[in-house]
């Protein structure tokens, strides 16, 4: 079997970023493969999240903080200057896009086709052609045309999703995976440095998955046997990365 990576955010900001990243990956998958009406679920979830909360201010603060840190790293010896310059340029461009006045995705509210679908998609089995004949018509279009439509819709969220992808890449890069052992299925750790993300890589052949809890200075990992759905009493070898 293969290694699986599990991630646990230790603050609400990273929790929100991971949710948005997850939806972004689903959007990309739907853009490259024809999943019929299922492509609308991540799109409408993203619309819902962006309407509940305007993430721009938080993301802009994070961009500024990371640009400041990258500038300091740039002055050090033995650093990957090309990689640092890439992130500086990418974050600077993302900041310019995110500073536009309109909220990401707000224009999609004016799309009558999407609005009609969104009202129905929360209802079980409501994608029948007698409920949504306009969806039935759209799905009959050639895949290339639907792909262009989908690209146009999701592009409204690029100013938000692009910097979040970069910020999460930088967060994950703050720690490497190290060997660890969960004795009797349990592992506990602490850190003098404030943490934002705990990452666990474990071989699926162990037949278990981790449940992770904690806050910025302390965390705990319990491994659960999948077949029995109860806490494992075995020693589990895994890889651990604690990201600042």
Curated annotation (Swiss-Prot):
Q: Is Cell cycle one of the keywords UniProt gives this record?
A: yes
Q: Where in the cell is it found?
A: Cytoplasm
Q: GO CC annotations?
A: cell division site; cytoplasm
| Biological process (GO), any one | FtsZ-dependent cytokinesis
One Pfam family of this protein, by short name?
Answer: ZapD
Which UniProt keyword terms apply here?
Answer: Cell cycle, Cell division, Cytoplasm, Septation
Q: Which InterPro entries does the protein's record reference?
A: ZapD (IPR009777), ZapD_C (IPR027462), ZapD_sf (IPR036268)
User: Has UniProt tagged this entry with the keyword Magnesium?
Assistant: no
Q: Which PANTHER family match?
A: CELL DIVISION PROTEIN ZAPD
What the protein does?
Cell division factor that enhances FtsZ-ring assembly. Directly interacts with FtsZ and promotes bundling of FtsZ protofilaments, with a reduction in FtsZ GTPase activity.
| Family named by the database record | Belongs to the ZapD family.
Q: Outline the subunit composition.
A: Interacts with FtsZ.
Protein name as annotated:
Cell division protein ZapD
Q: Which organism is it from?
A: Shewanella sp. (strain MR-4)
Q: Name the gene.
A: zapD
């Amino acid at each position: 079997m293969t290694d699986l990576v599990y991630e646990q955010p230790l603050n609400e900001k990273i929790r929100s970023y991971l949710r948005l990243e997850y939806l972004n990956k689903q959007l990309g998958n739907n853009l490259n493969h024809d999943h019929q009406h299922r492509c609308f679920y991540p799109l409408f979830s993203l619309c819902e999240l962006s309407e509940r909360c305007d993430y721009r201010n938080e993301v802009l603060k994070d961009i500024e903080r990371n640009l400041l840190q990258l500038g300091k790293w740039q002055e050090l010896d033995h650093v990957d200057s090309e990689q640092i310059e890439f992130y500086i340029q990418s974050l600077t461009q993302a900041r310019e896009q995110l500073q536009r006045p309109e909220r990401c995705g707000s224009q999609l509210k004016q799309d009558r086709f999407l609005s009609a679908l969104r009202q129905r998609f929360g209802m079980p089995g409501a994608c029948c052609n007698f409920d949504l004949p306009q969806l039935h018509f759209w799905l009959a279009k050639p895949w290339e045309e639907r792909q262009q439509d989908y690209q146009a819709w999701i592009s409204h969220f690029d100013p938000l999703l692009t910097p979040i992808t970069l910020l999460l890449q930088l967060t994950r890069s703050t720690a490497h995976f190290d060997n660890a052992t969960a004795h009797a299925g349990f592992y506990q750790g602490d850190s003098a440095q404030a943490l934002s993300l705990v990452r666990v890589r474990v071989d699926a052949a162990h037949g278990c998955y981790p449940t992770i809890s904690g806050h910025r200075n302390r965390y705990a990992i319990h491994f659960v046997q999948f077949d029995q759905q109860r806490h494992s009493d075995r020693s589990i070898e895994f890889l651990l990365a604690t990201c600042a």
